[in-house]
């Protein structure tokens, strides 16, 4: 299988940089997969789990929004936050969700809508984590 270069960058670190076979990305308009030779494309990311396949192994990384650019040079993702599942503290993640739920009653209007959307994304990630743990 042909490979391409992939960079995943967050404000804190370069989370990944290297040659890969495929990257599955949680796009705002729907999830999409990237292979070598993909057409140029720019997309916004939603919070979700990014799957990187390289050399027959998969690495899963949580991203909390950002921007993806596919060009002839490869795929670059600028993520608001990028955390490998290996680094994730699932107890702290669950506590974050509980805190978000508790603060919903303090929000109104558009702020409430955004808070609910973010909470839904976090709950979806948590559900995916629980499903991943079973496999």
UniProtKB/Swiss-Prot annotation:
Function of the molecule: Produces ATP from ADP in the presence of a proton gradient across the membrane.
Record keywords: ATP synthesis, Cell inner membrane, Cell membrane, CF(1), Hydrogen ion transport, Ion transport, Membrane, Transport
PANTHER family referenced in this protein's UniProt entry, alphabetically: ATP SYNTHASE DELTA/EPSILON CHAIN (PTHR13822), ATP SYNTHASE EPSILON CHAIN, CHLOROPLASTIC (PTHR13822:SF10)
Keyword Transport included in the entry's annotation: yes
Protein name as annotated: ATP synthase epsilon chain
Organism encoding this protein: Bradyrhizobium sp. (strain BTAi1 / ATCC BAA-1182)
GO cellular component assignments: plasma membrane; proton-transporting ATP synthase complex
InterPro entries: ATP_synth_F1_dsu/esu (IPR001469), ATP_synth_F1_dsu/esu_N (IPR020546), ATPsynth_dsu/esu_N (IPR036771)
Subunit structure: F-type ATPases have 2 components, CF(1) - the catalytic core - and CF(0) - the membrane proton channel. CF(1) has five subunits: alpha(3), beta(3), gamma(1), delta(1), epsilon(1). CF(0) has three main subunits: a, b and c.
Chain's gene name: atpC
Assigned protein family: Belongs to the ATPase epsilon chain family.
Organism ancestry: Bacteria, Pseudomonadati, Pseudomonadota, Alphaproteobacteria, Hyphomicrobiales
Topological relation to the membrane, as annotated: Peripheral membrane protein
GO MF: ATP binding; proton-transporting ATP synthase activity, rotational mechanism
